[in-house]
């Protein structure tokens, strides 16, 4: 049996009509103890409820309305023998409402033995409630009692016999000022809330007007505001003044009793502030925008048997961990402004718990619902199906919580996303929120790919009770039945703003790579994560692989063109003309090694002029260009039928290949674009082993491949090839180019006695045997010795290396095979002209050309053997612990088998 505790006594639960709050019970008990300090009658103590004495007082008030107040009776009858009480004093006791306080002799008449009022048996049988009487105007003696407290008599009879000290404390000016300030703040808060509601309703009305034909408009179903159960709790029919309500709230909160915290609100405000309690106070709740959040936060005010339900127990971990401190004002919910209408979701922009940013952008996307979330919103549906297509989506940032957030988020993140997907809300019979999820998904890629982004992939179709597997932060393929149309989902930029969740930078799953290779260090940008592909589906723009070469070879500034035989800027062009034609002698103040760049090119003219000569700038190249232009003009005047396009082509061709004497312009370009020295990063302090040597060679190969790409894209005419042909030529010829360049380095640095792969990786006889590729190393050393035997010049080496790039093609041909053949023929002619520059005898030129072409043919068998060796090593790399960089492994596994199978063959100058 539930009982009420008073001061010194235990009372049974009062009837429903006399059921009072904690505030009223407290002062009722205080009043009874003060007025009757003596022992009570046992029968009255056991049977009389706390409100019986109050009802007896009202009965006496109706019978003795004509009598004077108790204080005046005490003052006028001092000679009756009864002890006279002082009027004021620290220990004296007075009633709050003196007009309704019965006199002592009247109470003595009713029960002379015990001094207690009789039990209200007659009134309870007749059904008469507490009859309210209008208070009489107070006398002059009662002027100290404030008028506000005198109004509490009819409504709160329990306060009518409060002590003088308590009365004085409650009537202090500071307390009244505090109540007034609270009332003002409350009114200001209500005004701000009303303004926010009006603004949000206007935005929703604008969105509904612009929506597609009104088909996707938000239908708002009219429903009455829920009636709070606290009205019946306080008596229902009683009308409580504002001051009394505030006083009750202030005292109750100060005493830790939060039962009356929401009584001062209007019915509409009670819906907003108390919506978290509505579904559990009995009966099916009305349509409330905050109803789905009921199981997630708050406690139940009802003390009935429904307090310990499964729903409340299910979400108890989340209530204590996340929803602590939330009150009615912190919720992003408000009542609807429509008459009798249900409240719709209103999310202020200042709340961090709910989505607010994308709602401000809704004006640009009125036809859809945009809710920015990072994880799938999973959980049980609300008790009644919501008529609003976009209500109750709650947001949490997974980065703001600890490891326990994932379990809690699955319980409290759920919503009705019917407008985002064609259906698919979890059925009402689903179990825990973690086991069910909404099938509302959005596609990150195209509808054909069907790749989904999210923590779990749900099954489509919108069936009820379908269970899905939850995979946090996973990338899963869709199951059968889930199809994405282009117009069903918003663009990815709306779902994923800057900095929230990063997008997958690959157009398809086949392009995903596990790491970034060192070869991409010089290619940071939007295409930095891509690799070379064989098909056109994933081909990048040509400017990525082969951007134009526009850097001055002297100072590094932006080049304006080819001046005096070199690619230079306008400043270096003018400087070289004046310095070369002038008779002034320049002397460097330092050691002839000054730095010449864009900002310090004018500091040392001697070093700048020396660098111009090293780049190949000559005054004779200017004269040759003028002669070529004059010859073009004469040919243009002779033939009038030539089109302007053909004239431009002839002009470029003649200026490029006509009349070389000792320093052709073509060689200047080849010298300028020649790669520098690349190190392998090998640790020579460690003992040589097969795995260490081969791993260092693979790392060196990837680093050199970066320079090969940069060198090839700077070759004249190479960028005019088809983009597929460019990639194919590089992927097929990279091994021959590296072997040829390594042979030249071995010849120039160590006189072909060892293999000079890199400054930190030089192979001697011991390392050749240790690497298990001794036969290949011997052939490469023989190639290096050929450079010395044939006395190959640097100019011949540069031209032969460029020609070697165009010496291997697929058997089926390239995309633009005709242009490739023309470009290859031009480089062959350039090699022939370089040979003819230093040899006047035609027979000697032909013999030299034969020797150089035989040397080029000898590179192809060596490259083939190395292709076979690297392919076998890649297959056994896990067994022998040899590391292969990612790009090297890709090219060897994809392109090398084409060469070994005969689909790609080299082009030989001589019959093999």
UniProtKB/Swiss-Prot annotation:
The record marks 713 as: Interaction with coactivator LXXL and FXXFY motifs. There is a cross-link at residues 838, 840 (Glycyl lysine isopeptide (Lys-Gly) (interchain with G-Cter in ubiquitin)). Residues 544-911 are annotated as: Interaction with LPXN. The modification Phosphoserine is found at residues 69, 82, 266, 643. Its main location: nucleus. GO terms for biological process: androgen receptor signaling pathway; intracellular receptor signaling pathway; negative regulation of extrinsic apoptotic signaling pathway; positive regulation of cell population proliferation; positive regulation of gene expression; positive regulation of transcription by RNA polymerase II; regulation of protein localization to plasma membrane. Residues 455-465 have a biased composition (Gly residues). The keyword Phosphoprotein applies. Residues 35-156, 204-236, 375-394, 452-490 are annotated as: Disordered. PROSITE patterns: NR_LBD, NUCLEAR_REC_DBD_1, NUCLEAR_REC_DBD_2. SMART domains: HOLI, ZnF_C4. Residues 1-550 are annotated as: Modulating. Residues 551-624 bind DNA. Residues 226-236 have a biased composition (Polar residues). The record marks 890 as: Interaction with coactivator FXXLF and FXXFY motifs. Belongs to the nuclear hormone receptor family. NR3 subfamily. Composed of three domains: a modulating N-terminal domain, a DNA-binding domain and a C-terminal ligand-binding domain. In the presence of bound steroid the ligand-binding domain interacts with the N-terminal modulating domain, and thereby activates AR transcription factor activity. Agonist binding is required for dimerization and binding to target DNA. The transcription factor activity of the complex formed by ligand-activated AR and DNA is modulated by interactions with coactivator and corepressor proteins. This is Androgen receptor. The lineage of its organism: Eukaryota, Metazoa, Chordata, Craniata, Vertebrata. The gene is AR.
